[in-house]
From Swiss-Prot:
Protein name: DNA gyrase inhibitor YacG
Subunit annotation: Interacts with GyrB.
BP terms from Gene Ontology: regulation of DNA-templated transcription
Keyword Zinc listed: yes
Coiled-coil zones: none
Highest taxon listed in the record's lineage: Bacteria
Annotated positions binding Zn(2+): C7, C10, C26, C30
Length: 70
């Protein structure tokens, strides 16, 4: 059975095998369009910020001598 996927850029059907030169894209053009979208920040991977300013305030990071050696 042949597996096919849709090109992420143009939605054209692409055969998914080791001989598919540009997979998951149908062509070098579609691959470069996608790369340009990432470079211009049209695409982004959502992340949850681990930095919470309120938590730091509660820990005393705003104290002037917090980072001084004891």
């Amino acid at each position: 059975m042949t597996t096919t996927v849709k090109c992420p850029t143009c939605q054209k059907e692409v055969i998914w095998n080791s001989e598919s030169k540009f997979k998951p894209f149908c062509s070098d053009r579609c691959k470069l369009i996608d790369l340009g979208d990432w470079a211009s920040e049209k695409h982004a991977i959502p992340v949850k910020s681990e930095f919470d300013p309120e938590t730091l305030d509660g820990l005393g990071y705003d104290e002037a001598d917090f980072f001084k050696d004891q």
